[in-house]
């Protein structure tokens, strides 16, 4: 059964400052930051070999498992900190740094969503987790839904934030030049260079990722094959996943809910966390 949730809560994010923790892309003094150094926490960090790459992940809390997946290119586990803080109160959270991000290696394979889904499965197998919920933002949302499509027996529910139908040719993300992106937040990239295992390959990884995205076809045919319940969350002002693309995905998914957050951008949870969390919490609690 499908259900449409319209959320217009306009609550801001909590403010906390923990200067020693990793910053995330675009972070400001007003941004939420956890007390925990997500994405760089040696106390909970693990590695797993997935095909050609060592994938880094962290485990928090106890209870039913849920995988948390950050955004792509400029994304990091730290940006998902408020979700992890909330979920870890009564869930086991597996926060994965996807290949090429944070402390995970880049490898030699194209960083496709099929490959990233395989990486998620490798983590779950190492942790001996038979079935799980997944929550992802943007690139992480596409990875989560690809996992649900390719590994339905291991998927319970999926929360996909900022992700809609992506028809080949509909978006062109540029020529893959890393420098303009590096200048958007130099402090973030300087810090990332200190934890990434292959910092000298960042520009090449970035170009390879952009080339993949420019040819990506994540169409209704994929969404129609996802049997697990999916909650799509989108900001009303999302320019990366415009409303019409999310509506298209919603119509194609066999079992979907939709939450539209009024006046929110692509990272809707960064500006309207309580509104997003209310939808996520209710969805995950449903039998």
Residue ranges and their predicted role:
Residues 237-241, 266-267:
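Acidic catalytic loop of the alpha/beta-hydrolase fold
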Residues 251-267:
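Catalytic histidine neighborhood in serine/cysteine hydrolases
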Residues 263-287:
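Catalytic active-site module of serine/aspartate enzymes centered on a nucleophile-bearing elbow/loop
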């Amino acid at each position: 059964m499908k259900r449409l949730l319209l959320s217009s809560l306009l609550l801001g994010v909590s403010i906390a400052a923990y200067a020693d923790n990793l910053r995330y892309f675009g972070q400001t003094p007003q941004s939420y930051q956890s007390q925990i150094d997500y994405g760089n926490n040696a106390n909970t960090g693990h590695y797993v070999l997935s095909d050609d790459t060592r994938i880094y992940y962290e485990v928090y809390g106890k209870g039913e498992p849920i995988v948390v997946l950050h955004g792509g290119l400029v994304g990091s586990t730290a940006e998902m900190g408020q979700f992890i803080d909330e979920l870890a109160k009564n869930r086991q959270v597996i926060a994965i740094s996807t290949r090429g991000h944070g402390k995970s290696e880049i490898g030699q394979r194209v960083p496709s969503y099929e490959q990233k889904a395989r990486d998620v499965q490798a983590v779950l197998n190492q942790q001996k987790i038979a079935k799980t919920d997944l929550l992802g933002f943007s690139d992480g949302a596409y990875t989560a839904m690809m996992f649900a499509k390719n590994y339905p027996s291991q998927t319970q529910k999926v929360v996909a934030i900022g992700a809609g139908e992506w028809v080949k040719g509909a978006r062109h993300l540029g020529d893959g030049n890393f420098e303009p992106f590096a200048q958007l937040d130099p402090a973030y990239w300087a810090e990332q260079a200190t934890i990434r295992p292959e910092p000298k390959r960042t520009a090449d990884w970035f170009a390879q990722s952009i080339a993949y995205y420019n040819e990506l076809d994540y169409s209704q045919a994929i969404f129609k094959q996802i049997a697990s319940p999916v909650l799509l969350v989108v900001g009303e002002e999302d320019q990366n996943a415009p409303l019409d693309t999310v509506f298209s995905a919603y119509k194609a998914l066999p079992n979907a809910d939709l939450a539209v957050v009024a006046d929110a951008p692509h990272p809707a949870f960064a500006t309207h966390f309580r509104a997003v969390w209310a939808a996520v919490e209710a969805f995950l609690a449903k039998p």
